Swiss-Prot record:
Annotated positions for site Interaction with substrate tRNA: 101, 123
Record-level Gene Ontology MF annotations: ATP binding; tRNA dimethylallyltransferase activity
Organism for this UniProt entry: Trichlorobacter lovleyi (strain ATCC BAA-1151 / DSM 17278 / SZ) (Geobacter lovleyi)
Residues that, per the record, bind substrate: 12-17
PANTHER family, per the entry: TRNA DIMETHYLALLYLTRANSFERASE
Family statement drawn from the similarity comment of this UniProt entry: Belongs to the IPP transferase family.
Family matches, as Pfam families: IPPT
Record protein name field: tRNA dimethylallyltransferase 1
Cofactor: Mg(2+)
Keywords associated with the record: ATP-binding, Magnesium, Nucleotide-binding, Transferase, tRNA processing
EC number: 2.5.1.75
Interaction with substrate tRNA as annotated region, ranges: 35-38
Amino acid sequence: MKPRVLVIAGPTASGKSALALDLAVALDGEIICADSLTVYRGLDIGSAKPTAEQQRQIPHHLLDIREPTEPFTAADFKLAAKAAIAAICQRGKRPILAGGTGLYLRALLRGLNDAPGEDPVLRETLRKRLECEGAETLLAELAKVDPDTSQRLHPNNRNRIIRALEVFQTTGIPLSQFQAEHGFADSPYDSLQFCLDLPRPELYQRIDDRVDAMLAAGLVAEVQGLLQSGVPADCKPLQAIGYKEVLAHLQGEYDHNEMVRLIKRNTRHFAKRQLTWFRSEPAMQWVAYPENSATIHSAAATFFA
């Protein structure tokens, strides 16, 4: 029998962490965080990392396992999450995956394809073009040959933009087509997957409130502390939404009010991309939240019974 795993997904600020905590308490579970930022030590406020009190209440896995300068990929997440799930099940607890990084969830639950088209010389050429011409230029170029992939990517996803162009230019096949045709391996888990669905105005208000709370909690000071500790400004985690705008503000590119406006705007755009991603996941069940949270509790209890 495959291990059973409960998945709570959704856009940023939708309430995933709070719901996962409630479910873990009710189901005697432990939480595995599927988030590309909370894996990094020192990135606490801007990543909305579970608080120390929440971590004392329920064990949370895959938090603070990398330095900001250390790489962490979807493949790394898959390995770490598999080990965490095995350990949780061995203790007789219920594993609950919670997070908004769709690629991590897909890597664990459906697998990752190794696309063809490896060309280090072309990749370096594309990297130099990106530095000179900007990510938006290469993303627009990708949209002409692989619109499905381009719609899922943000200009910050530099490596993935380069990789998608590399695949197309070496094979003539869009990365999205390759993934669709080759499919994914059978999942090693029996999963029950929910995506939290909020009315867009409510979600955007939650985002605005969260950004205000992060700034009040000391997000700017957190970034200053990371820089003072020797974390380079161009390291990957500091290019994430929230951190990169604070960096630009500290470097004098714009004032505090503009920084706040951009963080809120960019986070809203990010949430829309997350929703688009989760809509492509065939096993994901969409649940109106928070009004139907009882439905999730009931289904999860039955699932683990």
